Amino acid sequence: MLKDLFGKKRKFATVPSETLARVPASTDISKEAGTKEKEVPEGLMNKCPHCGTIHYSKDLEKNLRVCKGCQFHYSMSAPERLQALLDDGVLREEFDANLITANPLGFPGYLEKLEQDMANTNLNEAIITGEGFLGGNRIVIGVMDSRFRMASMGSVVGEKITRAIEQAIERRLPFILFSASGGARMQEGVLSLMQMAKTSAALSRLDRERLLFVSVMTNPTYGGVSASFSSLGDYNIAEPGAMIGFAGRRVIEQTIRQELPKDFQTAEFLLKNGQLDMVVHRKDMRNTLSKLVEMHTSREGVETWQASSPLKSH
């Protein structure tokens, strides 16, 4: 009866100990049996940091680097943005491509970091400026590239923006600037900070000449950039979800000892509170900017605006 309470001991195939002794300890038995691990090439796929959707990198590029799952806008390089925006995908003329940053303060390791970014991005600085066509109209455009020193504004970045504005004035063209920056470049000290005043003064001259300036803020736009030229547009536009502000959320909360809203400093929060004119999806950006430029450059566009404007001259 007792033997009925217990099942029979199951038998398993065994490998003689002398056989195992002949197999080196470092041998992967699964590979010896013919099973091979498949390696995924680096950069083949990308995981959305917001919703976790997996994209093939090529599909993500075709979708203008926007997540198909949650519409999260990935950062774009300056060449990618120019290709997506301009009529021919390239600048008709690039300005000041040979301007290179020096190390005026002798900051340790600064030149080495610049050289590394130059090699990684194939750029000389954190912004590309030039003239191109948008919707058939000539424009002067600047695009910041966050791959280069987080697109921080140093003396060369400020100088290139100022010169681009001066070119817009000389050529009587609209000026469009895409911002993406961590702020002023600390390695250049006060030379970096004074670019805020210099670029703002140049935009004041552009305004006196009654020429259009459209500022497009992308993620992230912070510090001295948000406190100067990026907030001075005739139209201030941002991409969805872009983080825009001066100091970071944590610094502000620690200073005022209050909890901030969850959507604080997002493009949508700023639009709701009157600090932006539009939040425009990347797929609609080219069409939106084309319409704004057309409206402000053609006589037909001006007349259409005057007819629809509630502000009538007396």
From Swiss-Prot:
Q: Which residues form the CoA carboxyltransferase N-terminal domain?
A: 44-311
What's the protein name?
Acetyl-coenzyme A carboxylase carboxyl transferase subunit beta
Q: In which pathway does it act?
A: Lipid metabolism; malonyl-CoA biosynthesis; malonyl-CoA from acetyl-CoA: step 1/1
HAMAP family listed in its UniProt record? AcetylCoA_CT_beta (MF_01395)
UniProt family annotation: Belongs to the AccD/PCCB family.
Oligomer and partners: Acetyl-CoA carboxylase is a heterohexamer composed of biotin carboxyl carrier protein (AccB), biotin carboxylase (AccC) and two subunits each of ACCase subunit alpha (AccA) and ACCase subunit beta (AccD).
The free-text cofactor remark is: Binds 1 zinc ion per subunit.
C4-type zinc finger locations on the chain: 48-70
- Write one Pfam family the protein is assigned to: Zn_ribbon_ACC
* Summary of the function given for this chain in its UniProt record: Component of the acetyl coenzyme A carboxylase (ACC) complex. Biotin carboxylase (BC) catalyzes the carboxylation of biotin on its carrier protein (BCCP) and then the CO(2) group is transferred by the transcarboxylase to acetyl-CoA to form malonyl-CoA.
One GO MF term attached to the UniProt entry:
ATP binding
InterPro entries cross-referenced by the UniProt entry: AcCoA_carboxyl_beta (IPR034733), Acetyl_CoA_COase_Trfase_b_su (IPR000438), ClpP/crotonase-like_dom_sf (IPR029045), COA_CT_N (IPR011762), Znf-ACC (IPR041010)
Protein residues bound to Zn(2+): C48, C51, C67, C70
Q: Where is it predominantly found?
A: cytoplasm
Per the record, the domain of life is Bacteria
Q: Which gene encodes it?
A: accD
Does the keyword Nucleotidyltransferase feature in the UniProt annotation?
Answer: no
